[in-house]
Amino acid sequence: MSSSRPASSSSSRNRQSSRARVLAQTTLDAELNAEYEESGDSFDYSKLVEAQRDGPPVQQGRSEKVIAYLQHIQKGKLIQTFGCMLALDEKSFNVIAFSENAPEMLTTVSHAVPSVDDPPRLGIGTNVRSLFSDQGATALHKALGFADVSLLNPILVQCKTSGKPFYAIVHRATGCLVVDFEPVKPTEFPATAAGALQSYKLAAKAISKIQSLPGGSMEVLCNTVVKEVFDLTGYDRVMAYKFHEDDHGEVFAEITKPGLEPYLGLHYPATDIPQAARFLFMKNKVRMICDCRARSIKVIEAEALPFDISLCGSALRAPHSCHLQYMENMNSIASLVMAVVVNENEEDDEAESEQPAQQQQKKKLWGLLVCHHESPRYVPFPLRYACEFLAQVFAVHVNREFELEKQLREKSILKMQTMLSDMLFREASPLTIVSGAPNIMDLVKCDGAALLYGGKVWRLRNAPTESQIHDIAFWLSDVHRDSTGLSTDSLHDAGYPGASALGDMICGMAVAKINSKDIIFWFRSHTAAEIRWGGAKHDSSDMDDSRRMHPRLSFKAFLEVVKMKSLPWTDYEMDAIHSLQLILRGTLNDASKPKREASLDNQIGDLKLDGLAELQAVTSEMVRLMETATVPILAVDGNGLVNGWNQKAAELTGLRVDDAIGRHILTLVEESSVPVVQRMLYLALQGKEEKEVRFEVKTHGPRRDDGPVILVVNACASRDLHDHVVGVCFVAQDMTVHKLVMDKFTRVEGDYKAIIHNPNPLIPPIFGADEFGWCSEWNAAMTKLTGWNRDEVLDKMLLGEVFDSSNASCPLKNKNAFVSLCVLINSALAGEETEKAPFGFFDRSGKYIECLLSANRKENEGGLITGVFCFIHVASHELQHALQVQQASEQTSLKRLKAFSYMRHAINNPLSGMLYSRKALKNTDLNEEQMKQIHVGDNCHHQINKILADLDQDSISEKSSCLDLEMAEFVFQDVVVAAVSQVLITCQGKGIRISCNLPERFMKQSVYGDGVRLQQILSDFLFISVKFSPVGGSVEISSKLTKNSIGENLHLIDLELRIKHQGLGVPAELMEQMFEEDNKEQSDEGLGLLVSRKLLRLMNGDVRHLREAGVSTFILTAELASAPTAIGQ
């Protein structure tokens, strides 16, 4: 598959290519199925798959064959034998279709149940109420009132004739209600709780194990889930089957009973699981086949029905003959499959929080959890539902792993782009990113790369020959003339005539055109080179029958399909290549236009004005909030000493503000809370802000006997103007009264209803459910918060009708939020200890409410769990306002970071133009003095590049990686001349004379060290000296060198530079900023001096400042190594 680079976004391109791929794949599926139906025993799977690969491209469209195939898949009229099925008319509740085994299963008379009436007969038109006891019939009829009838599954019903219990599993189909009936085994305790409540109890251990995983490894997550499903279901083999971008599948994780051949690492063609089957998995997320050898049961329909009854949603739907043969060939007699459905792309996560739940994001099938058994096996519906719930929890964690992988991937690509950009800006030639380290092969995963530049070719590793590169470039200019780039996983499929000559080792290619003649290529080998068989070695004497569908044959077919294909190029890889393409184009262009410089100046000016005003407003607002807030707010400095303690904190603890200031925070909290506060303080000082942390604060004076104050706290790192963390602010909420109320509930003492419905504002919003999942409590505070009255939500399903991801009273943001709520409530019902969890929902008016939710079990006098109580904690208006101000401050910082990024990028372009101009001048007829000036410009350019690289770092500190040193040979004369040149214009404006009393021996001395950093240091101190010199004054530079021998040919040089200037000297405030990193009023000049001092200390030196009558002197010291030769010798 190949594509020229479009103008649309990555997600748009992804959706378009996905739709095209599904259409093409569905056509292939239909052709395979038709061939199978027509061929019978002569069907040759391997040859047919290979023929599809080598044949002409399929015609995408709704051909008669495809439509017939889809109808055959979705409208089969057969069911499996482990239950029976009825289709009911919703208005009359009469039977309009039934399976042939339904009369026997539902109406057979049992001698253990005496009856004077004739047994009911089951047929078309029978009213279903006549078949079951009154309680069961009523429960079935109740399901009609639900928009989503599956909420009540399974419904426990009892036959009138036999008294046998059945699970009734209800779902809606076109024009009717389809009910599956599965008998309850005598050894099985029948499920009475609705839906997820009963299922969670079965899957609680497995869910807890998954929830406890630290994250960061998809492999660990998949291995854990297959192990838990293996223990939960008892199947012989459990696999995590992952779909790749091109729809082919891979056994990503596996566990088996001893003695089975492993399938781990096998890859299967996309046709092994047809697109129609994947669509059904999206609708019906659990699929069980009990016995692939059992005879299917026919479904009898009423005559002249105006519609076809679809069994797509039925758990009893019979599998198709092709799949049954595949199962038997691999000796898998029974199977259970759960769909793993995830978000289609990460961008939707950010958008969806701004929209009501009804506008659901797109989903995709990530893969399947597949269970196989070597003998017939039946899993009761409650356990299947538990497996489905477990798969939903697993999908939530898969989404999280995707997000984490995306962040790490973007960080890695950004780092590589920055390094390549710096290399380009230093040399202004694409050759540097081919011959240097890192190079273009480090940007994206590939097996080889090449650069075609100026008619010449540079090759890296597994790349075509020089003549083949020229041939590919000619083909691109002829066939893809208008595109700026190209990506393909198969040069053969893309139509390149020389693909066969390249062989299997070069199949995929990505291209970035710098201009019409200069091109960068990336190459990939065939996919089979990346695939490794993860199971047992194949016995060479065991010849595969190509007509016998089997996992090993599927693997072989897959290798044939991808023989001339590479791994596909992902959207993020192409975005990285496109970014490098833009950088290359900008670097190689001439000097930027003056308009861009003017735009940069304007944006910098606007940023300074807007940023300063916004920062002042935020600071004033924060101070006012802290003093007047009705929530406790406390602050500490970097040493943990209290420097903020508002009136609310003093009121709650009895400790006055004056008494609290200056005390260490750990002395003010209860001993049990010391580790919690220590951790919170440590992380906040590192810039990692924790939220919703609970700890207890001691009480003093008149409050001493009241016991500790319980606070739930958000930590906010306090930063200075230069973004250094200088302290921590704690915005808290008093939870003492809240805890007393909760304690009263958990003890189940007295009349709790009097508390629930108390209008006292101290009573938080509370709702509850009984052990069956029906909403049983909804207090006045909850009505005020949601807009829904008590009588509108009572006796509704809490999970599904009151709270759900769609069509509920209080819609949740997405399916992941619903799964998290299910886990929390069911954990409490299972008797587990739960912690507060972030929670959000849309109220009646559509406003999104963010809060904390805690769930607590409700017990009767005998200690049995009879339900769950849930407490909602919503932040006060003051706390919400404080968080908004904090968010505004963070947005201001983010704007500045983005501005820095823009400035860095925008500055580099004119610098590249200047570099180009200087290189062009070098090729002209210049005299020696003119060449020296060009050399000075080059040195200043290197200094700017070094400073711009520092902007990529998060902070400037002594331990920061941005203040690094590069060891290289340089001459003092180059450093001094370049540094002095940077202040000459200022000197001319003030009439200041600079004299360099430096001996020639010093100027010609060749040394090892970081000459660019030394140049930066010298220029900074020269600038300060000139700035604070009087008009008409002078600045003098002198030096002293001391050599210390540390070997025969190696000496250490102790360098001392003195910069003396006239006048009153540098202000004391500015000098303090040079020595004090945490100075809150640090100026630009102060920061420059601070950085220069840090650089000197990295060179084992320092700076001193002497002030005499009318004269001030900076004394700079550093340690360097002497080079073996000197210039001119």
From Swiss-Prot:
Residues 217-402 form the GAF domain. The keyword Transcription applies. GO terms for biological process: detection of visible light; red, far-red light phototransduction; regulation of DNA-templated transcription. Residues 1-24 are annotated as: Disordered. Transmembrane segments: none annotated. Residues 1-21 have a biased composition (Low complexity). Homodimer. Regulatory photoreceptor which exists in two forms that are reversibly interconvertible by light: the Pr form that absorbs maximally in the red region of the spectrum and the Pfr form that absorbs maximally in the far-red region. Photoconversion of Pr to Pfr induces an array of morphogenic responses, whereas reconversion of Pfr to Pr cancels the induction of those responses. Pfr controls the expression of a number of nuclear genes including those encoding the small subunit of ribulose-bisphosphate carboxylase, chlorophyll A/B binding protein, protochlorophyllide reductase, rRNA, etc. This is Phytochrome A type 4. It comes from Avena sativa (Oat).
